[in-house]
A protein has these predicted regions:
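Short, low-complexity, Pro/Ser/Thr/Gly-rich segments in the mature regions of secreted, periplasmic
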Residues: 141-149
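Bacterial Sec-dependent signal peptides at the C-terminal "C-region" and cleavage site
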Residues: 8-26
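Sec-dependent signal peptide recognition
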Residues: 1-8
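General secretory precursor processing signal
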Residues: 3, 60, 110-112, 136, ...
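N-terminal helix-cap/turn-to-beta initiation motif at the start of protein domains
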Residues: 27-44
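Short, solvent-exposed coil/turn segments at beta-strand boundaries
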Residues: 39-40, 60-69, 87-88, 122-129, ...
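Contiguous, well-ordered beta-strand patches that form the walls/edges
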Residues: 48-55, 70-128, 134-136
Length: 150
């Protein structure tokens, strides 16, 4: 059935009704969208080298769009879930829960199993740099990370 706008208006003007489309099948396209948090991607912690004789050590965090994170520090490998949310007062908060830790030595020389641990930080982000702060005002920021990959 081919229906035009003029045909519908003419039919209505003469006291007619609209055709019953209940028998007509319609296909509706479904579109999925994902909103990525600002921190999605891979970040590297800036580490100060305390001993020139020691090889350089890298600590990296990868935040996925599915609220999964993967971390590595020296020989240590971890993964888990994260939540990044606006607090309404001050900086956004980042909560990371470690679900697995291989309990290997990290860049600071420590060997601690962090499985089950939850880290909470407030995030101050400027361009390709992110700082993890202890307070929502961003006055006590101990860790600075640089974006490696989007």
């Amino acid at each position: 059935m081919n229906i035009s706008l003029i045909g519908i208006l003419t039919s209505l003007a003469m006291g007619g009704t609209l055709p019953d489309d209940s028998k007509t099948q319609q296909q509706v396209a479904q579109v999925s969208t994902h909103i990525l948090p600002n921190i999605a991607g891979q970040w590297q912690l800036r580490l100060d080298k305390t001993d020139a004789a020691q090889p350089s050590c890298q600590e990296r965090y990868n935040f996925g769009r599915d609220q999964q994170f993967i971390g590595s520090s020296g020989q240590e490998f971890t993964y888990g879930k994260y939540l990044y949310a606006d607090t309404g007062d001050g900086l956004p908060a980042l909560a990371i829960q470690t679900q697995y830790d291989n309990n290997a030595t990290d860049c600071s020389g420590n060997r601690v199993d962090q499985t089950g641990d939850i880290l909470v930080a407030y995030v101050k982000q400027q361009g390709e740099q992110m700082q993890w702060c202890k307070d929502s005002k961003g006055t006590r920021c101990d860790m600075t990370l640089q974006r490696v990959l989007p």
